[in-house]
């Protein structure tokens, strides 16, 4: 029997009760704020939307005054937010409940460990597995921190709802507290008036560590080792989860990321983890009141106690407390040194020294019958030190390949080596770069020539990276990523810059050079690029110095925008197969970093299915993936959700490593041949419209809120790398975000339907083949399930209203092309799946959408009317911000919009 997703155990009746309470409170609060006739319009809007009377809905919205729009927009933006909180609370409850009753569910860690324990190499698999969620600052998280804090209060109150029902908590007080926070939300600015700075993004990310990661990651690691031990598997230093960070180091297209922000990101992370250690040591100090008149302590703990400055006469026999006081003093001194560069006392040189002191405490307890004392907080502190060190999360550096080329060209020219580097052929570039890397020890930047702002900025960042690695530990920065990598020279250019600051030499690399292959063309050529790189004796030395791992990043967003969903998915799948094979050929462990976004159009979708549908052998023992924008809040907003989602990552990775699927052995060639045919056609269909139709550019910009999104204060990074004059110049995130707002969800399905329909029409038996692929091939099943989900969130009636924003009839006519493909895609997906309706296999999401859709559908009509008024010049600058409120509300309702 196949396991159910944990969400499907959800108690829908409790969620509905909570949503009813929240809705009634919001209505009552809003009623008190508005004139009776305005509030009555809110009720009418809800009724019209529930009845799917879109014409009536449109008429009523059109009649609203600008002032009425203010409160009505807020109401319908807050309502889906409250529904989200209720669902999150129920999921958190279910996580605890199902674990406590020992109920199996899809991705449960205990079930996965039991499965892997049967393998001969179980210890090797579990010891070396490392899954890394990498937090990014991609601008799709539209909520202010103040709003996030308020929603956390409501979340905490709803966690108590079941106790309220049982009479264990005073109902009136609970109800009044809930009302108070909803009322504050109703009167709080939902969106930012000022654009975020990188420093704000760093601070915001740290909130997730304090609220969830610092609890969930050590807890999961402890449980991981405990479960392995229960099966006779002794793990020594397993780190199934470590954390990554882009904020402060990702400067691709973001001019505000500098050496200063890189340093600030690293030191802020350091401060967070050092404060955590300080707090945990103090808690142990309070707890460990053990007296030597009752139990003995080890010689090492006695020595630590002797060195302690805790000289209270009341501590003479409490040697553990005195030892912990000494440890805490060292931690505080270490924090001051690392952050303020000031020596204030005896400190730790490395996190490993801190770990050794904790091990001394642990061993003393074990030697003296204190086994139970090292469970819980103590063992999780040990895990935290192993995982987080003094740096918390490894920060990636990322920059566009064109920037690296410009910097190297300038260096070569100023050093008198070559004045026209950029004009050289690829072969000539590589020959020149390899000569500099292998034979010339000089530092090219050590000339008196004045450096451009670009070169000075890049060198400053790399110099800062080296300083941080020396101070906080080598793992604080492990990777530096090349966006839009297209060739071997792109990788060698980065190596030249790293050589300038001593991060690579002829024997080793202190950071890994990671190419990011993004477009369909670059992914197709990635095998050739990596073959050339792995053939270099110099690269082999660098890889050897990184434990024989070579990471490659895969770009989901740009490949989708470039060739459509089907083409993107298949090209990425084949690239992984080819790159894995090349790694095996050269004896290198190729690992993948998946640059996935929140939406299907950017590689999103259910994480477990996404990982378990990867090609065979593509997951060695490491996998990294980005966690972006609003997805971070949804997945990791509280410790229970964080634990569950991290558990899904770990279990999925293990399952893909050890489970041999039917599609891995029996029929892959047949399936792949079919996919090649279908994908080629899908690519052409997509490109013909997006890049081949001269009116498409105008259609996109006129029929979506892209201009409002570009001016939205939802991130430090600009919406485009350059002035937008074509679709290609637009970043993938606002591209996807805009289609989500207009409810077309175009990037997640366009080109899928017709390509499969044409294949089916060639031979009536082909539908049976596709159904067989759906039943037996996880990749294909995941692909179609994601399209199914995207279609369920689209609304072509609303999309038509956005199309009406186009003035030119030829431009407007593109809607019919999109609508026809939408209908074909829906019919084909249902035919292959064998279902009568969308989301037949996902009852949890279907129920969720059923009761939230009517509310945020209203926001689309409000947004449409506001855009019309803006274009007619009928909105003040303050009133134009209402469009941003509707963007926020729709994004909240969809939950994965960017």
UniProtKB/Swiss-Prot annotation:
Pfam families tied to this protein: PEPcase
Keyword Transmembrane helix: no
This enzyme's EC code(s): 4.1.1.31
Enzyme class: lyase
Active site: 138, 561
GO BP annotation list: carbon fixation; oxaloacetate metabolic process; tricarboxylic acid cycle
InterPro entries reported for this sequence: PEP_COase (IPR021135), PEP_COase_bac/pln-type (IPR022805), PEP_COase_Lys_AS (IPR018129), PEPCASE_His_AS (IPR033129), Pyrv/PenolPyrv_kinase-like_dom (IPR015813)
Catalyzed reactions per annotation: oxaloacetate + phosphate = phosphoenolpyruvate + hydrogencarbonate
Annotated keywords: Carbon dioxide fixation, Lyase, Magnesium
Cofactor: Mg(2+)
GO cellular component: cytosol
Alphabetized GO MF terms: magnesium ion binding; phosphoenolpyruvate carboxylase activity
Function: Forms oxaloacetate, a four-carbon dicarboxylic acid source for the tricarboxylic acid cycle.
Family per record: Belongs to the PEPCase type 1 family.
Protein name per its UniProtKB record: Phosphoenolpyruvate carboxylase
Gene name for this UniProt entry: ppc
